[in-house]
Amino acid sequence: MEGTSRALSYGFEVGDMVWGKVKSHPWWPGHIFNEAFASSSVRRTRREGHVLVAFFGDSSYGWFDPAELIPFDANFEEKSQQTNSRTFIRAVEEATDEASRRSALSLACKCRSKFNIQPANEAGYFAVDVPDYEPGGVYSVNQIIKARDGFKPGEALAFVKQLAAGPHGCDQNGLEFIKNRARVSAFRKAVFEEFDETYAQAFGVHSSRPLNDTSKVSKQLAKEPTRGIGLFVFP
């Protein structure tokens, strides 16, 4: 599609988190939405050469020329402080939560449960259950690969050491801190062993290794991503 091609020419991909400006509103956090997941009524409003952006906080959306968008991460510090309105703060909180989940996505796999990652209804997309986040988040193969490439063991270890040496010396509201914290937490859950064999042997505890509970399967393989769109439209 022409809109997607233009997005690529500006360094964006479908799924990328961005800031978009609408008339008198402040720059608002959102993400470039795959048109395949949109309703027919939304697709009918499509504008040539534009991409569909779903915004956080108020379920609004709009068609944007990629030239009108700016990257989410690089502009977070400035744009997240624009106003104290409750609606805007809620949108930033939702966007920050999504950025955290995408960071934790790097450690999602079928190691513990084969149901963690399931094919979505759109080719090339998967519904992923990331621990501590809303289940059934839908991501493309490229997004999952990008998330995994973003996990650097050495950097994660350096982050933990930095926290241990000076827990109050970090900007805990900064986006990088939030994303690093999500990765470390996800790693902790990925390697956590409920059954400690060494402990059991040392203290003579006769407990059995728990079996994976396959009954806790996410029944919500959404037809569209959890961040839905469609209540309001910006021209």
Predicted regions span which residues?
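Extended, charge-rich intrinsically disordered regulatory tails
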Residues: 178-235
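Acidic, Ser/Thr/Pro-rich intrinsically disordered low-complexity regulatory segments
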Residues: 1-4, 218
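Epigenetic mark-reader domains in eukaryotic nuclear proteins
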Residues: 3-12, 44-202
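Short beta-strand-centered aromatic/proline hotspots
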Residues: 27-35
